[in-house]
Amino acid sequence: MSDRLTLLRPDDWHIHLRDGAVLPHTVGDVARTFARAIIMPNLVPPVRNAAEAGAYRERILAARPAGSRFEPLMVLYLTDRTSPEDVRAAKASGIVYAAKLYPAGATTNSDSGVTSIDNIFPAIEALAEVGMPLLVHGEVTRSEIDVFDREKRFIDEHMRRVVERFPTLKVVFEHITTSDAAQFVTEAPANVGATITAQHLLYNRNHMLVGGIRPHFYCLPILKRNTHQVALLDAATSGNPKFFLGTDSAPHARHAKEAACGCAGCYTAYAAIEMYAEAFEQRNALDKLEGFASLHGPAFYGLPANTDTITLVREEWTAPDSLPFGEQTVVPLRAGEKLRWRLLEENA
């Protein structure tokens, strides 16, 4: 078994960078490993049009480390009021690569999200016409639906209908967490793909809840039972190009996580590819990591793969207990724990 693993430089097809004083920290972490990233638009206020996307992009570019060529790929936040003209203008801007469907109330800063998918059918039709992917946070939000069932219910109530109604639309089922979602994507047409996070490959709800509540494992969609974790590992390591890397790295200040009503989100950008390598190694599937991390995503988006490389070495190191986050700190996933792979920084 080799102690070195060289991959074409990967991209992150789903990340939260936040805004303001924290950007130098979050952008620095993602740029360390990834060439490009799909930037989530759930700011306050959200990124609703091409002009707002352009302004946010400039703030991200200004926060890049010296010499970095990291490229943010911007995303439009869909609301009930998003028009086909908004979609066409976003496409014409050349900097917006997708549009994001957040059901209202599904996750952090989603209050401006879509209250009924039917409300945005004209915008979705425009997405299909211009060839821009629809990114979907696939959970229903009705209070009577159990939090562990919300992804499956979304598939049954909405996802199948959208895919059937818009057969040419590229759809990314983001951060899938269930065997139901993995099966749906596998059986769907080629224009339907999915991202999978490192935490959903490495952990299940027992890790979050047994022996005490661990708030830094709490994210949305929530970790599920181990049978779903196994199904996600099967999908990610299968070599199926429908599945690709999306960290959903989502930082919150320590006090916002370690609280009586803590925020959802795991911060993984600082060591994401190292964590994915651990998950793939558990399946003896390190040979499949480059496809998942570096090839499948660009192919789905119709973009070229990166040509430079990164190298991981099998070397234990201890994750930091906390990281700077503006004037505060963020506790990363795996804080204080050993990681088995390390990125050679000279290749970053």
From Swiss-Prot:
Family annotation (Gene3D superfamilies): Metal-dependent hydrolases
Superkingdom of origin: Bacteria
HAMAP family: PyrC_classII (MF_00219)
Subunit structure: Homodimer.
GO biological process annotation, one example: 'de novo' UMP biosynthetic process
GO molecular function, one term: zinc ion binding
Cited Pfam families: Amidohydro_1
Residue sites binding Zn(2+) 1 per the record: 14, 16, 100, 248
Family named by the database record: Belongs to the metallo-dependent hydrolases superfamily. DHOase family. Class II DHOase subfamily.
Protein name as catalogued: Dihydroorotase
Protein task: Catalyzes the reversible cyclization of carbamoyl aspartate to dihydroorotate.
Cofactor(s) essential for the protein: Zn(2+)
Source organism: Pseudomonas putida (strain GB-1)
CDD domains: DHOase
UniProt GO cellular component terms: cytosol
Pathway: Pyrimidine metabolism; UMP biosynthesis via de novo pathway; (S)-dihydroorotate from bicarbonate: step 3/3
Catalysed reactions, semicolon-separated: (S)-dihydroorotate + H2O = N-carbamoyl-L-aspartate + H(+)
